[in-house]
Amino acid sequence: MEIILGIVQGLTEFLPISSSGHLSVFSKLFNLKPDLSVFALLHLATLAAIVIFVGKELTEIIKGLIKLEKNYINLTLKIIVSTIPAAIFGVLLESKIEASLSNLKIISFFFLVTSAALLISDKIKGNKDLSTLTYKDALVIGIMQALAIFPGISRSGFTLFGSLLIGLEREIALKYSFLVSIPVILGAGLLEIKNISLNSYSISSAIVAFFFGLLSLFILKKATISKNLKIFSAYCIFISIFSFVLGGIK
Protein backbone atom coordinates (compact mmCIF):
# COMPACT_ATOMS: atom_id res chain seq x y z
CA MET A 1 0.00 0.00 0.00
CA GLU A 2 2.87 2.38 0.74
CA ILE A 3 4.16 1.88 -2.82
CA ILE A 4 0.73 2.77 -4.21
CA LEU A 5 0.66 5.95 -2.12
CA GLY A 6 4.14 6.77 -3.41
CA ILE A 7 2.99 6.43 -7.02
CA VAL A 8 -0.11 8.52 -6.34
CA GLN A 9 1.92 11.21 -4.59
CA GLY A 10 4.59 11.32 -7.29
CA LEU A 11 2.10 11.66 -10.13
CA THR A 12 -0.35 14.00 -8.43
CA GLU A 13 2.05 16.33 -6.58
CA PHE A 14 3.03 18.07 -9.80
CA LEU A 15 0.29 17.18 -12.24
CA PRO A 16 -2.36 19.82 -11.49
CA ILE A 17 -4.85 17.41 -9.95
CA SER A 18 -4.09 17.77 -6.19
CA SER A 19 -1.89 15.22 -4.46
CA SER A 20 -3.48 15.78 -1.04
CA GLY A 21 -6.93 15.31 -2.55
CA HIS A 22 -5.92 12.03 -4.19
CA LEU A 23 -4.17 10.74 -1.09
CA SER A 24 -7.34 11.44 0.89
CA VAL A 25 -9.47 9.63 -1.71
CA PHE A 26 -7.15 6.60 -1.73
CA SER A 27 -6.99 6.58 2.06
CA LYS A 28 -10.78 6.52 2.20
CA LEU A 29 -11.05 3.94 -0.57
CA PHE A 30 -8.71 1.50 1.20
CA ASN A 31 -9.85 2.41 4.73
CA LEU A 32 -6.57 4.02 5.70
CA LYS A 33 -6.39 6.72 8.35
CA PRO A 34 -5.07 9.98 6.83
CA ASP A 35 -1.64 10.61 8.35
CA LEU A 36 -0.13 14.04 7.75
CA SER A 37 3.32 12.79 8.78
CA VAL A 38 3.26 10.17 6.01
CA PHE A 39 2.08 12.79 3.55
CA ALA A 40 4.95 14.99 4.73
CA LEU A 41 7.54 12.29 3.98
CA LEU A 42 6.14 11.87 0.48
CA HIS A 43 6.20 15.64 0.01
CA LEU A 44 9.88 15.73 0.95
CA ALA A 45 10.57 13.01 -1.62
CA THR A 46 8.86 14.95 -4.38
CA LEU A 47 10.63 18.12 -3.21
CA ALA A 48 13.87 16.50 -4.37
CA ALA A 49 12.30 16.11 -7.81
CA ILE A 50 11.47 19.84 -7.91
CA VAL A 51 15.05 20.75 -7.02
CA ILE A 52 16.26 18.75 -10.01
CA PHE A 53 13.60 20.21 -12.31
CA VAL A 54 14.44 23.84 -11.47
CA GLY A 55 18.08 23.13 -10.69
CA LYS A 56 19.38 25.59 -13.28
CA GLU A 57 17.24 28.42 -11.92
CA LEU A 58 18.13 27.60 -8.31
CA THR A 59 21.84 27.58 -9.15
CA GLU A 60 21.55 30.98 -10.84
CA ILE A 61 19.68 32.42 -7.86
CA ILE A 62 22.23 31.09 -5.36
CA LYS A 63 25.16 32.44 -7.41
CA GLY A 64 23.38 35.78 -7.77
CA LEU A 65 22.78 36.02 -4.02
CA ILE A 66 26.42 35.22 -3.28
CA LYS A 67 27.45 38.03 -5.64
CA LEU A 68 24.77 40.30 -4.11
CA GLU A 69 23.25 40.96 -7.53
CA LYS A 70 20.20 43.18 -7.13
CA ASN A 71 17.93 41.33 -9.55
CA TYR A 72 18.44 37.99 -7.78
CA ILE A 73 17.99 39.58 -4.36
CA ASN A 74 14.69 41.07 -5.55
CA LEU A 75 13.61 37.74 -7.05
CA THR A 76 14.35 35.95 -3.78
CA LEU A 77 12.32 38.52 -1.84
CA LYS A 78 9.42 38.03 -4.25
CA ILE A 79 9.60 34.27 -3.77
CA ILE A 80 9.40 34.90 -0.01
CA VAL A 81 6.34 37.13 -0.55
CA SER A 82 4.75 34.31 -2.56
CA THR A 83 5.41 31.94 0.34
CA ILE A 84 4.11 33.98 3.29
CA PRO A 85 0.34 33.59 2.64
CA ALA A 86 0.60 29.79 2.59
CA ALA A 87 2.55 29.82 5.86
CA ILE A 88 -0.08 32.03 7.51
CA PHE A 89 -2.99 29.94 6.19
CA GLY A 90 -1.25 26.75 7.29
CA VAL A 91 -0.83 27.94 10.89
CA LEU A 92 -4.30 29.46 11.23
CA LEU A 93 -6.25 26.69 9.50
CA GLU A 94 -4.34 23.55 10.51
CA SER A 95 -7.31 21.95 12.29
CA LYS A 96 -9.65 22.67 9.38
CA ILE A 97 -7.14 21.18 6.94
CA GLU A 98 -6.94 17.95 8.96
CA ALA A 99 -10.75 17.78 9.11
CA SER A 100 -11.12 18.33 5.37
CA LEU A 101 -8.71 15.45 4.66
CA SER A 102 -11.47 13.02 5.64
CA ASN A 103 -14.43 14.88 4.10
CA LEU A 104 -14.68 13.69 0.50
CA LYS A 105 -17.65 15.90 -0.31
CA ILE A 106 -15.61 19.01 0.49
CA ILE A 107 -12.69 17.61 -1.49
CA SER A 108 -15.06 16.92 -4.39
CA PHE A 109 -15.98 20.61 -4.54
CA PHE A 110 -12.34 21.69 -4.47
CA PHE A 111 -11.55 19.35 -7.36
CA LEU A 112 -14.14 21.27 -9.40
CA VAL A 113 -12.49 24.56 -8.44
CA THR A 114 -9.17 23.21 -9.71
CA SER A 115 -10.84 22.07 -12.93
CA ALA A 116 -12.17 25.57 -13.60
CA ALA A 117 -8.77 27.18 -12.94
CA LEU A 118 -7.06 24.82 -15.38
CA LEU A 119 -9.63 25.45 -18.09
CA ILE A 120 -9.12 29.21 -17.78
CA SER A 121 -5.33 28.78 -17.71
CA ASP A 122 -5.34 27.28 -21.20
CA LYS A 123 -6.91 30.47 -22.56
CA ILE A 124 -4.54 32.96 -20.91
CA LYS A 125 -1.75 34.49 -22.98
CA GLY A 126 1.32 36.00 -21.34
CA ASN A 127 4.69 37.30 -22.47
CA LYS A 128 6.28 38.74 -19.32
CA ASP A 129 9.52 37.47 -17.82
CA LEU A 130 10.58 37.48 -14.17
CA SER A 131 12.22 40.90 -14.49
CA THR A 132 8.75 42.45 -14.81
CA LEU A 133 7.34 40.63 -11.77
CA THR A 134 6.17 43.06 -9.08
CA TYR A 135 5.66 42.43 -5.36
CA LYS A 136 1.92 42.73 -5.94
CA ASP A 137 2.18 39.99 -8.58
CA ALA A 138 4.15 37.84 -6.15
CA LEU A 139 1.44 38.31 -3.52
CA VAL A 140 -1.28 37.25 -5.98
CA ILE A 141 0.63 34.04 -6.70
CA GLY A 142 1.17 33.57 -2.96
CA ILE A 143 -2.55 33.79 -2.27
CA MET A 144 -3.18 31.19 -4.96
CA GLN A 145 -0.64 28.92 -3.30
CA ALA A 146 -2.24 29.52 0.10
CA LEU A 147 -5.63 28.36 -1.20
CA ALA A 148 -3.99 25.11 -2.26
CA ILE A 149 -3.49 24.01 1.36
CA PHE A 150 -6.95 22.45 1.09
CA PRO A 151 -7.09 18.95 -0.43
CA GLY A 152 -8.63 18.99 -3.89
CA ILE A 153 -7.08 22.34 -4.82
CA SER A 154 -3.88 21.72 -6.75
CA ARG A 155 -0.82 23.68 -5.63
CA SER A 156 0.86 23.40 -9.03
CA GLY A 157 -2.40 24.18 -10.81
CA PHE A 158 -3.23 27.24 -8.72
CA THR A 159 0.26 28.75 -8.62
CA LEU A 160 0.50 28.23 -12.37
CA PHE A 161 -2.94 29.82 -12.75
CA GLY A 162 -1.83 32.81 -10.66
CA SER A 163 1.43 33.15 -12.59
CA LEU A 164 -0.43 33.15 -15.89
CA LEU A 165 -3.04 35.61 -14.58
CA ILE A 166 -0.37 38.23 -13.92
CA GLY A 167 0.96 37.77 -17.45
CA LEU A 168 4.05 35.57 -17.19
CA GLU A 169 5.11 33.58 -20.26
CA ARG A 170 3.94 29.98 -19.92
CA GLU A 171 7.23 28.17 -19.28
CA ILE A 172 8.45 30.95 -16.98
CA ALA A 173 5.13 30.80 -15.11
CA LEU A 174 5.60 27.06 -14.64
CA LYS A 175 9.15 27.41 -13.32
CA TYR A 176 8.20 30.24 -10.93
CA SER A 177 5.25 28.25 -9.61
CA PHE A 178 7.64 25.49 -8.57
CA LEU A 179 10.26 27.85 -7.18
CA VAL A 180 7.69 29.31 -4.79
CA SER A 181 6.47 25.85 -3.79
CA ILE A 182 9.89 24.77 -2.50
CA PRO A 183 9.77 26.68 0.85
CA VAL A 184 6.16 25.59 1.48
CA ILE A 185 6.74 21.90 0.78
CA LEU A 186 9.99 21.95 2.75
CA GLY A 187 8.34 23.68 5.69
CA ALA A 188 5.41 21.26 5.77
CA GLY A 189 7.75 18.30 5.64
CA LEU A 190 10.05 19.59 8.37
CA LEU A 191 7.16 20.36 10.72
CA GLU A 192 6.05 16.72 10.62
CA ILE A 193 9.41 14.99 10.15
CA LYS A 194 9.80 14.37 13.89
CA ASN A 195 6.72 12.12 13.72
CA ILE A 196 7.87 10.14 10.70
CA SER A 197 8.75 6.50 11.29
CA LEU A 198 11.40 5.48 8.78
CA ASN A 199 11.30 1.85 7.66
CA SER A 200 11.75 -0.11 4.46
CA TYR A 201 8.15 0.50 3.41
CA SER A 202 8.14 4.26 3.94
CA ILE A 203 11.55 4.65 2.30
CA SER A 204 10.42 2.60 -0.71
CA SER A 205 7.32 4.78 -0.95
CA ALA A 206 9.44 7.94 -0.91
CA ILE A 207 11.77 6.63 -3.63
CA VAL A 208 8.81 5.73 -5.84
CA ALA A 209 7.28 9.18 -5.25
CA PHE A 210 10.56 10.82 -6.30
CA PHE A 211 10.82 9.07 -9.65
CA PHE A 212 7.14 9.40 -10.51
CA GLY A 213 7.41 13.05 -9.47
CA LEU A 214 10.12 13.64 -12.06
CA LEU A 215 7.97 12.00 -14.70
CA SER A 216 4.95 14.14 -13.86
CA LEU A 217 7.02 17.34 -13.95
CA PHE A 218 8.00 16.79 -17.55
CA ILE A 219 4.44 15.81 -18.48
CA LEU A 220 3.15 19.05 -16.95
CA LYS A 221 5.80 21.12 -18.73
CA LYS A 222 4.72 19.73 -22.09
CA ALA A 223 1.02 20.18 -21.32
CA THR A 224 1.52 23.77 -20.14
CA ILE A 225 3.49 24.89 -23.17
CA SER A 226 1.12 23.18 -25.63
CA LYS A 227 -1.97 24.51 -23.79
CA ASN A 228 -3.33 21.06 -23.01
CA LEU A 229 -4.23 21.64 -19.37
CA LYS A 230 -7.83 20.96 -20.37
CA ILE A 231 -6.99 17.25 -20.16
CA PHE A 232 -6.32 17.63 -16.43
CA SER A 233 -9.39 19.84 -16.09
CA ALA A 234 -11.56 17.03 -17.45
CA TYR A 235 -9.89 14.52 -15.14
CA CYS A 236 -10.57 16.74 -12.12
CA ILE A 237 -14.28 16.65 -12.98
CA PHE A 238 -14.13 12.85 -13.09
CA ILE A 239 -12.30 12.52 -9.75
CA SER A 240 -14.68 15.09 -8.24
CA ILE A 241 -17.68 12.94 -9.13
CA PHE A 242 -15.89 9.80 -7.95
CA SER A 243 -14.92 11.32 -4.59
CA PHE A 244 -18.43 12.70 -4.06
CA VAL A 245 -19.97 9.27 -4.66
CA LEU A 246 -17.32 7.58 -2.51
CA GLY A 247 -17.97 10.08 0.26
CA GLY A 248 -21.64 9.12 0.25
CA ILE A 249 -20.90 5.39 0.39
CA LYS A 250 -18.09 5.17 2.94
From Swiss-Prot:
Coiled-coil stretches: none
Pfam families xrefs: BacA
Membrane topology annotation: Multi-pass membrane protein
EC number: 3.6.1.27
Cellular compartments per GO CC: plasma membrane
Subcellular localization, as worded in the UniProt entry: Cell inner membrane
GO molecular function: undecaprenyl-diphosphatase activity
Miscellaneous comment text of the record: Bacitracin is thought to be involved in the inhibition of peptidoglycan synthesis by sequestering undecaprenyl diphosphate, thereby reducing the pool of lipid carrier available.
HAMAP family xref list: Undec_diphosphatase
Similarity annotation: Belongs to the UppP family.
Record-given protein name: Undecaprenyl-diphosphatase
Organism listed in the record: Thermosipho melanesiensis (strain DSM 12029 / CIP 104789 / BI429)
